[in-house]
Amino acid sequence: DPYNSLAKDRDMLKGISTHEYDYEATTDMRLFCKQYRVTIWLCTHANTEAIRQVYRDGLYQGYPKTPESSSIEGGGKFVNRCDFFAVCHRFIQHPTEFMNSQLHIKKVKSISSGGRCTPLDDPIMLKAITNNVGYSINNESLVKKLKAINAPF
């Protein structure tokens, strides 16, 4: 479930705003990750205004635009507090593009390992393989690669 589905501590909310609460929560998450050397993948949804934005023309005319980093519920504070931020966008009602998922990498704090943001109009494309048995990534089937290297699974 996304972050906004989690119940907030009502006693803590009596003294601070939800904005401050979210900052406290994300600070606690960062400290937890640092202390235990783990990663948290925090899922959120786009805010209502972002969902109303649609493409005006082209293949996706009339379908929701890809949300920006600051378009998440709760605003840009989540982007400001994280080391890595990605947006997964799907056109689930599109007659031909419903099986595609676009992965937009919006923030990479540490680029020393070779990571970087995706270009604005060139996301990583994941296409569901027939019968939903996996994905091809940028039109390259990972299933075929695994078979070629004789992977044990």
Regions found by a protein language model. Name each.
Residues 16, 31-36, 49-153:
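C-terminal regions of RecA-like/P-loop NTPase motor modules
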Residues 38-45:
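Structural recognition of the conserved hydrophobic beta-strand(s) that form the central parallel beta-sheet
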Residues 5, 45-50:
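Signature of the SF2 helicase/ATPase Hel1-core->accessory helical subdomain module
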Residues 1-30:
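Helical hairpin unit composed of two closely spaced alpha helices linked by a short loop
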